[in-house]
UniProtKB/Swiss-Prot annotation:
Lineage of the organism: Archaea, Methanobacteriati, Methanobacteriota, Stenosarchaea group, Halobacteria
Provenance organism: Natronomonas pharaonis (strain ATCC 35678 / DSM 2160 / CIP 103997 / JCM 8858 / NBRC 14720 / NCIMB 2260 / Gabara)
Protein name: Peptide methionine sulfoxide reductase MsrA
Biological processes, Gene Ontology terms: protein modification process
Gene: msrA
Matches recorded under NCBIfam families: msrA (TIGR00401)
Homology family: Belongs to the MsrA Met sulfoxide reductase family.
Reactions performed catalytically: L-methionyl-[protein] + [thioredoxin]-disulfide + H2O = L-methionyl-(S)-S-oxide-[protein] + [thioredoxin]-dithiol; [thioredoxin]-disulfide + L-methionine + H2O = L-methionine (S)-S-oxide + [thioredoxin]-dithiol
Amino acid sequence: MTATATLGGGCFWCVEAAFEELDGVESVTSGYAGGHTEDPTYREVCSGNTGHAEVVQVAYDSDVLAYEDLLEVFFTVHDPTQLNRQGPDVGSQYRSIVLYHDDTQRELAEAYIESLDEAGEYDDDIVTEIERLETFYRAEENHQNYFEKNPQDAYCRMHAQPKIETVREAFAEKVDSR
């Protein structure tokens, strides 16, 4: 059965590339959500005035992957303790955010963060926002499958490639062998 998750953990090019590695992921779409501007553009989101975050919407086969699996990958490939930034990318559009589609996703996200806190996984507080998804706006076409189309891009080699390698190593049993 196809299910959907919407997550933001920094630059969507990098997060998209990481999730595309997983068996059971049917598609990953880069976009914007969590803000107040209707149908925003990349330039508008980058201005920091729309309230939106760069996010990915992951369509996945819930018979192959659980929502909790996606959360585990998500919290492994980005730093949820960085407020309004990820690495060199600074601004609220790069914030850590889980946009839930239903109460079950909300409860699972809250429980997952609580388990990370209890386990002392991070030295700093987790600042990941958990909000109901109101509207997802698909990003412009040049942002879709960006790493796949631009594997030699210096930014992607420096930031997306390590996320991909992390997924391949830490989640080898879940990586798509296509």
